[in-house]
Amino acid sequence: MPKNLTPILEAIEPVIIGHDCELVDLEYVKEKSQDYLRIYVDKQPNGIDIETIAELSELVGEKLDSMQPDPLPDPYILELSSPGLERPIKKEQDWEKAKGQYIHVGLYQKLEGEKVFEGHLLDLDDQEIKLEIKIKTRRKQLTIPRKQIASARFAIEF
């Protein structure tokens, strides 16, 4: 499994941007005995359609096949899809879009006895985020240092 996906990212991002789309995430995983290169793309403002995904899948596949040296010499399955409603929050622009939205945050270490929080993102800066969480019937503001955040994504509020 490649440790560095940067050459792949640098090769395919211009193809994706050239179709007015955004590269949301890229991952290379092994499931059972099969390797997968998963590429998540989106298009603003209304999301990406299946025709665009199919076209990008073809173009990205061709781009990857033409790379020398081959960054993925072992056989793999290419999956290109929308990130869905619970898209990851990774880049700074993702965090900005998440302001006021309901999000899921996973931490490296427990904070106030928990490693996972869901709530509305009230504010953020370079150092921390402010999340409004609900504990039973009361609301509480929680400040989380950004360096403690292992993962974040949009969430669906029930």
UniProtKB/Swiss-Prot annotation:
Annotated signal sequence range: none
GO terms classed as biological process: ribosomal small subunit assembly; translation
Cysteine pairs bridged by disulfides in the record: none
Regions crossing the membrane: none
Pfam families (UniProt xref): DUF150_C, RimP_N
Compartment(s) where it occurs, according to its Swiss-Prot or TrEMBL record: Cytoplasm
Main location, first listed in the record: cytoplasm
Keyword check for Cytoplasm: yes
CC annotations in GO: cytosol
Record keywords: Cytoplasm, Ribosome biogenesis
Function comment: Required for maturation of 30S ribosomal subunits.
PANTHER family: RIBOSOME MATURATION FACTOR RIMP (PTHR33867:SF1)
Protein name in UniProt: Ribosome maturation factor RimP
Underlying gene: rimP
